[in-house]
Curated annotation (Swiss-Prot):
Species name: Bacillus licheniformis (strain ATCC 14580 / DSM 13 / JCM 2505 / CCUG 7422 / NBRC 12200 / NCIMB 9375 / NCTC 10341 / NRRL NRS-1264 / Gibson 46)
Record protein name field: Aspartyl/glutamyl-tRNA(Asn/Gln) amidotransferase subunit C
EC number, as in UniProt: 6.3.5.-
Top EC group: ligase
The family this protein is said to belong to: Belongs to the GatC family.
Gene: gatC
Keyword entries, A-Z: ATP-binding, Ligase, Nucleotide-binding, Protein biosynthesis
GO MF terms, alphabetically ordered: asparaginyl-tRNA synthase (glutamine-hydrolyzing) activity; ATP binding; glutaminyl-tRNA synthase (glutamine-hydrolyzing) activity
SUPFAM superfamilies: Glu-tRNAGln amidotransferase C subunit
Described purpose of this protein according to its UniProt entry: Allows the formation of correctly charged Asn-tRNA(Asn) or Gln-tRNA(Gln) through the transamidation of misacylated Asp-tRNA(Asn) or Glu-tRNA(Gln) in organisms which lack either or both of asparaginyl-tRNA or glutaminyl-tRNA synthetases. The reaction takes place in the presence of glutamine and ATP through an activated phospho-Asp-tRNA(Asn) or phospho-Glu-tRNA(Gln).
Subunit structure: Heterotrimer of A, B and C subunits.
């Protein structure tokens, strides 16, 4: 029994604005099903004596101090934009 249906794959593709064929949907359904099966196998692993961790490695990200600085002049920023108005960059609408 498949853990994910072709309809669910097509729905997710639609939400991501991806056009996929029926053959691709079937292929992705098989691939996602095998990924989900593998993830379910992890639930069977005995982790009784494993202490919880948030990072596998002991490395840490060391960030520099965030120092506010003066930005670029608006004129310099908008001169490279293909379309701008009143100091704002105009972009095509992506929402219906």
């Amino acid at each position: 029994m498949s853990r994910i249906s072709i309809e669910e794959v097509k729905h997710v593709a639609h939400l991501a604005r991806l056009a996929i064929t029926d053959e691709e949907a079937a292929m992705f359904t098989e691939q996602l099903d095998s990924i989900i099966s593998f993830a379910e196998e992890l639930n069977e692993v005995d982790t009784e004596n494993v202490k919880p961790t948030t990072h596998v490695l002991q490395m840490k990200n060391i960030m520099r101090e965030d120092v506010p600085d003066k930005g670029l002049p608006v004129e310099d920023v908008v001169k490279n934009a293909p379309d701008h108005k009143d100091g704002y960059i105009r972009v095509p609408s992506i929402l219906d």
